[in-house]
């Protein structure tokens, strides 16, 4: 005697040599439906993770996650908001010098942003890959390192000169033509493959203070680098710093951030649809089995098998289909993800010629699998309830 009996019967109902071909096809299609749903969900989420990680590395690693400043963008270092130190998720707080300027060359004019940097603090400049140019940014000469795209726009190269113009804040000074103008020699060009290549100009911090006419101990503000820039409670920071202007990366990248949120909602919608289709497959498969096995169910009941164990038979049947489908889909998705070249080749056939970043999250894969299995098992409840609601005498009398 096979024990436990309900597991043996459930697995026999799933697959045995005497099962009609039509039922085998239904079971195979149910497993394939779940597998395709799982694999498409995992691949899509992995691609979204890749884009999010690329966004974090290519853009958020070069811009401040939070900026604390005032209306004039000119603030005394001694007024540092100490309440900020109480915040969690903060990796680093540093002061900075920054200003938008007009860039002028012989025949070109553009808008850029100067960043005053401390050449002794190389840690914050690692992503720029400018180690070989960094020594040129000493305070004795007005030198600059500019982005590669900006250099192309201005048609300049190393050793060329550019004129930087700072517009005054007040209209009176503007009408009096009281402008800060300085010639800078280009001593390096950086390329980060991000948008900062189009506008950033790195100059020595002391030169930036002199060029912008900042008083002693005055700065533009403080920039905060977060451990995870996607975990951001800007309202809490504003409450702690009521006398300052608080700007976060979402303000600067608002449209892009909204697009990412919309993508997540669309992904959630498709995830729910796939769940519904998978559950529907299980319901159809189990309902057909229940209708076919009505006589068997009545015989089991008349032989003393409890309704609870009859329920377990069909739970075993439904959960096995779900687990096999989930395992199949997960394996296929992981194989495709690791074959990045093949996946990129498929995407390039149907879409444009772009490189798709992919990042696997084992926790997300586990969560997807558990959710699918749990909900598909829940979907077995209706066929099971249908199976046990009738009495054995009524079923057998109908035959």
From Swiss-Prot:
Q: Where in the cell is it found?
A: Cell membrane
Membrane spanning stretches: 25-45, 266-286, 312-332, 358-378
What top-level branch of life does the organism fall under?
Bacteria
Q: Where does the protein principally reside? A: membrane
- Keyword Transmembrane helix assigned to the entry: answer is yes
Picking any one GO biological process from the record gives: lipoprotein localization to outer membrane
Give the record's keywords alphabetically: Cell membrane, Membrane, Transmembrane, Transmembrane helix, Transport
Topology within the bilayer: Multi-pass membrane protein
Give a Gene Ontology cellular component term annotated to this protein: plasma membrane protein complex
Function text: Part of an ATP-dependent transport system responsible for the release of lipoproteins targeted to the outer membrane from the inner membrane. Such a release is dependent of the sorting-signal (absence of an Asp at position 2 of the mature lipoprotein) and of LolA.
Member of which family?
Belongs to the ABC-4 integral membrane protein family. LolC/E subfamily.
Instruction: Check the record and name the PANTHER family matching this protein.
Output: LIPOPROTEIN-RELEASING SYSTEM TRANSMEMBRANE PROTEIN LOLE
What protein name applies here? Lipoprotein-releasing system transmembrane protein LolC
This chain's source organism reads Buchnera aphidicola subsp. Schizaphis graminum (strain Sg)
């Amino acid at each position: 005697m096979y024990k436990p009996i309900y597991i043996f019967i459930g697995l026999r109902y799933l697959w045995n040599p005497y099962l009609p071909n039509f039922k085998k096809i239904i079971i195979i299609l149910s497993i394939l439906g779940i597998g395709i749903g799982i694999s498409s969900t995992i691949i899509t989420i992995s691609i979204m993770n890749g884009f999010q990680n690329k966004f974090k590395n290519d853009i958020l690693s070069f811009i401040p996650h939070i900026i604390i400043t005032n209306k004039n963008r000119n603030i005394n270092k001694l007024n540092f908001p100490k309440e900020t130190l109480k915040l969690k998720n903060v990796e680093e707080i540093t002061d900075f010098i920054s200003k938008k300027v007009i860039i002028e060359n012989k025949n070109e004019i553009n808008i850029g942003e100067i960043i005053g940097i401390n050449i002794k603090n190389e840690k914050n400049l690692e992503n720029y890959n400018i180690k070989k140019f960094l020594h040129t940014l000493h305070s004795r000469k007005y030198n600059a390192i500019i982005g590669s795209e900006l250099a192309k726009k201005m048609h300049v190269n190393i050793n060329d000169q550019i004129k930087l113009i700072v517009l005054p804040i007040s209209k009176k000074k503007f009408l009096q033509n009281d402008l800060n103008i300085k010639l800078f020699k280009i001593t390096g060009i950086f390329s980060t493959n991000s948008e900062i290549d189009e506008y950033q100009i790195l100059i020595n911090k002391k030169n930036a203070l002199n060029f912008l006419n900042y008083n002693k101990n005055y700065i533009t503000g403080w920039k905060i680098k977060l451990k995870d820039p996607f975990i951001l409670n800007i309202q809490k920071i504003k409450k702690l710093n009521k006398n300052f202007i608080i700007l976060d990366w979402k303000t600067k990248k608002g449209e892009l951030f909204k697009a990412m949120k919309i993508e997540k909602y669309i992904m959630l919608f498709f995830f729910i649809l796939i769940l519904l289709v998978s559950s529907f497959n299980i319901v159809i498969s189990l309902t057909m089995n229940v209708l076919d096995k009505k006589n068997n169910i009545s015989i089991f009941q008349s032989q003393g098998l409890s309704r609870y164990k009859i329920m377990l038979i069909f739970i075993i049947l439904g959960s096995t289909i779900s687990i096999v489908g989930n395992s199949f889909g997960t394996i296929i998705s992981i194989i495709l993800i690791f074959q990045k070249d093949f996946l990129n080749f498929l995407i390039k056939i149907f879409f444009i010629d772009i490189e798709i970043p992919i990042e696997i999250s084992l926790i997300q894969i586990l969560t997807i699998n558990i959710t699918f299995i749990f909900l598909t098992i829940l979907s077995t409840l209706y066929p099971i309830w249908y199976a046990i609601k009738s009495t054995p005498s009524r079923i057998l009398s109908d035959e």
